[in-house]
Amino acid sequence: MLSHYGEDAGIYAGGTELLLAMRHQTLNYRHLIDLKVVPGLDSIEARDSFIEIGATSTHRSIERSALVRQNQPALAEMESQVANVRVRGTGTLGGNLCFAEPHSDPATLLLVLGGAVKVESATGAREIPVGELIAGAYASNLLPGEILTKITVPCAKPNHRAAYMKFQVHERPTLGLGLWLETPDEARTFTSARVAVGCVCPFPTRGLDAEKLLTGSRGEVEKRLPDAADKIADAADLVDDHEGSAEYKRHLIHVFLRRVFHKVLGGPPV
């Protein structure tokens, strides 16, 4: 159907972003293809050491899934913070990722969790890391005729810690920060780290240079948090806009990196 209608057709999953864009005439489609009628696209299953989430699974269903809460609690908690109850009840994870709204939560956390998506077309299927799916603000790297059908997230391991925090004043978040740490000894040392920032840049961005500063003993890492925050801000290429100045956003990154670090450790925010 998508190959038949081509650019005249839009993919409808939850519609929370799509219908708003069509109402404001920033998107115009003559046809909408409803994925919610496709059996199995709303499933949430465990397979080997991964959680497989169907593209039309709503934020609310992921938030409430016992399987997700048990195997990747950071994801369930993040989904409980998405937008509002109405959006969580109708909006889908697959639609959220494909629409690539810059001021959104899921992709930033999925980036540090090592999430990937499966996309399919009439000619075949392929898997894309979440970090390669989003090309920019409101733009994905899906090829013509491709549909996102599944999101795959690694299950948390006992020596893995992850958390997501955001700063939000208006309808959408100003900043989102995700952190994943590997620790062999109950958070006394960290052998691997992934950190990503979203909302302050066109698409979620890994702080690769910052990650090098987030490994080592807990005391060493805590001392390096300010330098790591600067590395994250540099990677995000901050600019002045209606959400605030680049300097203000850099300050937020400093504040929330420390907060999310302590949250990962199980302590209160500081």
Enumerate the language-model features and the residues they cover:
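C-terminal structural segment of proteins
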Residues: 1-270
